[in-house]
Amino acid sequence: MDANLLGEKYAISVGVDIKSLRMWLIILSCVLTATVVAFTGPIAFVGITCPILARMICGTSKHIYVIPVTMLLGAVFLVVADILTRPGVLISSTNVLPLLCPLSIIGAPIAIIIYLKIRKMGI
């Protein structure tokens, strides 16, 4: 994957079959995404925001660093959101909030910050 990030010409020069790699990456992405959504539900914020934050934290796009940081960020976000949904944390009630409520509260400012940083960088 890292060779593909450096461009098609570089990937071809080091012996990567671009068409095959892209096909397998698309298939793998679809299968993994479908599996995760089937088990956890559509928590889109975590899946979209954590990889972007991981790249910003790592300062690189090398997958050997970004993937573990993304997994840790996703786990931390979900644990924090789960703690916030417990009774008496955000609201003083015996009811439990849906998980997407605190994710939206946490996610909106983070998404705005990411958007502003990306816009500032001109990407």
Curated annotation (Swiss-Prot):
GO cellular component: plasma membrane
Coiled-coil regions, chain positions: none
InterPro entries registered for this protein in UniProt: ABC_BtuC-like, ABC_transptr_permease_BtuC
Listed GO MF terms: transmembrane transporter activity
Pfam families: FecCD
Main location (coarse class): membrane
Membrane topology: Multi-pass membrane protein
This protein's record includes keyword Lyase: no
Domain of life of the source: Archaea
Location(s) in or outside the cell: Cell membrane
Keyword Transmembrane attached: yes
Segments traversing the membrane: 26-46, 64-84, 96-116
Keywords: Cell membrane, Membrane, Transmembrane, Transmembrane helix, Transport
Functional description taken from the UniProt entry: Probably part of a binding-protein-dependent transport system. Probably responsible for the translocation of the substrate across the membrane.
Family per similarity comment: Belongs to the binding-protein-dependent transport system permease family. FecCD subfamily.
The protein, known as: Putative ABC transporter permease protein MJ0877
